[in-house]
UniProtKB/Swiss-Prot annotation:
Residues 34-48 have a biased composition (Low complexity). The chain crosses the membrane at residues 71-91, 104-124. Coiled coil: none annotated. It comes from Arabidopsis thaliana (Mouse-ear cress). Keywords: Developmental protein, Membrane, Transmembrane, Transmembrane helix. It is found in: Membrane. Residues 21-48 are annotated as: Disordered. It comes from the Eukaryota. Its main location: membrane. Pfam families: DUF502. This is Protein CONTINUOUS VASCULAR RING 1. GO terms for biological process: stem vascular tissue pattern formation.
Length: 268
């Protein structure tokens, strides 16, 4: 009897072991089947998240692009209106205090009075008496140490855009080959010079090439035959320089050499 009990116990243990093994296998199978749905759900969530990020990036890029387009369109309009409004207020401020003392507080009267005053000054300075007064005033200004430099610079700018062709500083717009071969510089013809050091006299054009500002630049003497004259007026050339070349037309065509210059060259 004592020997049968260990045998029975061993048999029970073997039976329990056989019963436990399938149970463990089935548990492993259940774990594998349950891991598949979890992995598929994580993959679907990651794909949904990536699509959401792509959509958000697209919306943000589209919105920023449209916003910058609106800024590009509205910025020059806003700057133009702001400068115009500031200029009207600035000019109106010269005579509006006089009207305010008289009890007239109508906006625009000072501006109209300033415009009329500028027109009358132009009419007066065009006469012989006005020119004499202007020369006398310039004589005093040019003897002031610091003021004369400011006056000369501002006068050069105003003379450059003067409608009087006789006193206009910039005669024509010019394009010259400078500083190296294959490169061109944009400038203005200010005068013509005849060089007599050579066996045959050579006509040179004095070309002013602005560097940073309109009143700062280099003066180059270029043969008149090497000067390219585009179909641009002086005002258009000044706009190109002030805008940093952004207002340059896409296509430029050249014009013929002025007849006066040709006749002068042939007479030499």
């Amino acid at each position: 009897m004592g020997d049968e009990k260990p045998v029975i116990v061993m048999a029970n243990r073997e039976r329990d072991r056989e019963l436990l093994i399938p149970v463990a296998d089935s548990g492993d199978k259940d774990d594998g089947s349950s891991s598949k749905p979890s992995s598929s759900s994580s993959a679907s969530s990651s794909s949904h998240q990536s699509s959401h990020e792509t959509l958000s990036l697209f919306i943000r890029g589209w919105a920023s692009k449209k916003f910058m387009t609106g800024c590009v369109i509205l910025l020059p309009i806003a700057i133009t209106f702001y400068i115009t409004w500031w200029f009207i207020h600035f000019v109106d401020g010269f005579f509006s205090p006089i009207y305010a003392q008289l009890g007239i507080n109508v906006f625009g009267f000072g501006f109209l009075t300033s415009i009329a005053f500028i027109f009358l000054v132009g009419v007066f300075m065009s006469s012989w008496l006005g020119a004499s007064v202007l020369n006398l005033g310039e004589w005093f200004i040019k003897r002031m140490p610091f003021v004369r430099h400011i006056y000369n610079a501002s006068k050069q700018i105003s003379t450059a855009i003067s409608p009087d062709q006789n006193t206009q500083a910039f005669k024509e717009v010019a394009i010259i080959r400078h500083p190296r071969v294959g490169e061109y510089a944009f400038g203005f013809i200010t005068s013509t010079v005849v060089l007599q050091n050579y066996p045959t006299e050579e006509e040179l054009c004095c070309v002013y090439v602005p560097t940073n500002h309109l009143y700062i630049g280099d003066i180059l003497l270029v043969n008149s035959n090497d000067v390219i004259r585009p179909n641009l007026s002086v005002r258009e050339g000044i706009e190109i320089v002030v805008s940093g070349g952004m207002s340059m037309p896409q296509i430029l065509s050249t014009v013929d050499k002025p007849l006066a210059s040709i006749d002068r060259a042939t007479s030499l």
